[in-house]
Amino acid sequence: RQAITNWNRTSFEGSLPGAVCVGKAGKAPFGDLVERPIPQWKNSGLLSYVSVRESLKGDTLFCRLPYNAQITPYLKVEAEAGKTIHIRMDNYEGGSERNVRAEYITREGEQEYESYGWMNGHEVYYIIPEGVKVLDVKYRETGYNTDLAGSFHCDDPFYDELWQRSARTLYITMRDSYMDCPDRERAQWWGDEVNELGEAFYALSPSGQKLAVKG
């Protein structure tokens, strides 16, 4: 709530401290720079949720996504200063430990916030305290830049749906590397990658193969 607002917009009329050079490319603290071997992330822009419903007490918004996605949640509110809004996913307690969540402390008046620490799941929970009026909620889907290009069809609906779910599972475990799972173990594991890279040839557009080459 003490942050300088709109400093990154051309309409900003305030003043900022002078820029400081902390290091040159190829030198400390950065080290050698290398060309990124995979595409930049896919970015959907801000999107409306499939549906939004309130809890019985009216203190929580349950915002449905179209599928299990990697997203950054957004809100626009009018609030008193010092109110804490909690944001988490339905996958927050999906493993052995609680995982990714966000908090936003309000300032006085109308304001917007997007939590850039990405999280994933099927539904976003906004827990809203008294003294906060919600004006809008949205989400931004980001992820590895490839398309679900493969297809499968048979006379059994079970296997058709299994294909769709498997392709979505493959995609949700991709970002800067293949990962065990996107909600708690985001490190690359070769055991998982071996399975996933084999699926990528059948399910994804060619750009998906670059993640396996990166290793």
Which stretches of residues belong to each language-model region?
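Extracellular/oxidizing-compartment recognition motifs
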Residues: 1-183, 191-192, 207-213
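Well-ordered alpha-helical scaffold segments within catalytic/enzyme domains
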Residues: 195-206
